[in-house]
From Swiss-Prot:
Cofactor note text: Binds 1 FMN.
SMART domains xrefs: NADH_4Fe-4S (SM00928)
Function: NDH-1 shuttles electrons from NADH, via FMN and iron-sulfur (Fe-S) centers, to quinones in the respiratory chain. The immediate electron acceptor for the enzyme in this species is believed to be ubiquinone. Couples the redox reaction to proton translocation (for every two electrons transferred, four hydrogen ions are translocated across the cytoplasmic membrane), and thus conserves the redox energy in a proton gradient.
UniProt cross-references to Pfam families, sorted A to Z: Complex1_51K, NADH_4Fe-4S
Gene: nuoF
Protein name: NADH-quinone oxidoreductase subunit F
Key word DNA-binding present: no
Annotated keywords: 4Fe-4S, Flavoprotein, FMN, Iron, Iron-sulfur, Metal-binding, NAD, Quinone, Translocase, Ubiquinone
EC id: 7.1.1.-
Source organism per UniProt: Escherichia coli (strain K12)
SUPFAM superfamilies assigned to the protein according to its UniProt record, in alphabetical order: Nqo1 FMN-binding domain-like (SSF142019), Nqo1 middle domain-like (SSF142984), Nqo1C-terminal domain-like (SSF140490)
Binding-site residues for FMN, renumbered to this chain: 174-221
Binding site for [4Fe-4S] cluster: C351, C354, C357, C398
Amino acid sequence: MKNIIRTPETHPLTWRLRDDKQPVWLDEYRSKNGYEGARKALTGLSPDEIVNQVKDAGLKGRGGAGFSTGLKWSLMPKDESMNIRYLLCNADEMEPGTYKDRLLMEQLPHLLVEGMLISAFALKAYRGYIFLRGEYIEAAVNLRRAIAEATEAGLLGKNIMGTGFDFELFVHTGAGRYICGEETALINSLEGRRANPRSKPPFPATSGAWGKPTCVNNVETLCNVPAILANGVEWYQNISKSKDAGTKLMGFSGRVKNPGLWELPFGTTAREILEDYAGGMRDGLKFKAWQPGGAGTDFLTEAHLDLPMEFESIGKAGSRLGTALAMAVDHEINMVSLVRNLEEFFARESCGWCTPCRDGLPWSVKILRALERGEGQPGDIETLEQLCRFLGPGKTFCAHAPGAVEPLQSAIKYFREEFEAGIKQPFSNTHLINGIQPNLLKERW
């Protein structure tokens, strides 16, 4: 396994991490160039210049979609009279197999605070909320302390750095619903409403939280902003090995020797992460399949391990980069059981707002349970494939159901024989008496 040496030039997100895994508080953070990006942004650049710099750097959303952050920011209204605007941080990290944002919030809370400060200035937002997964108790404590430290130091609140810019930041803990990872469901929950996605348009940029212009960004996305402002566009683009700029928190979980999370340049291959960082599979286990970016991404096979971890390459292979935290599957794991477990999670976490998702996902679970018991019926696999089509992109209110069926459709594609093994074999003619199944004879007679 590789010995990682983190430097500001190669690991802009994680170079400040302590070896003892304790949080980096304000004094230490500032001694390591902390809030330098914020100083440059607030005292030397206009909001539009910051938006253009982030756009030119090529920063893409790190929550899974990979949409241009600068372009998303530029969708906010230019009308100066719309002076009540919100910046929301999506920290509702509940995707199974995903744990990258937790590291940043627990150990580098000021990095997120600085990223939100710069972003709020660029968006002309006067208030921000970190919508945090309720189970992340340590992250909540550390973020609130970091906000208090920043406020006392004049880095949050009124007239920040003497610029006349005001920005307040709050932590809001969720109530344990996965669907709040969808930005409009998050907004509804923040407002105290039922956490279901909203119809678009209007988009949050024009009518979001409390009907005001709102921008929602992922934790890791916001944490990339300070380094871009501190070091420049060209530097940010050059630390990548791909046309996707910058670095990414990537990892491997499953029954590997060293499961974990590492900051790596885009373009690093999945095989390199698995073998050089995660140490390969545990002794006695053979690699079988993997999901590139969390539970809601399509399975790929060993033949895909040499793909670079970047949005386009993984997309062309038939999956999504997602969160870039891959999950390894070994030869002892039955794909029907694994997919059934995933689909149970997605069915339970459906908000129930639209019929295809509300009824379709539990139906898939019912069929998978039967296949797992060896009691599947002829046509069950075809029904599952049909469900995948009916729950695909554009067929439901949000992206929950399309993501939920990605592991199902890909598991059938690559491991169909394991699903076929769960089909109950029909009686042959030798097992019939006058065309009647033996267990039905008593009912007939």
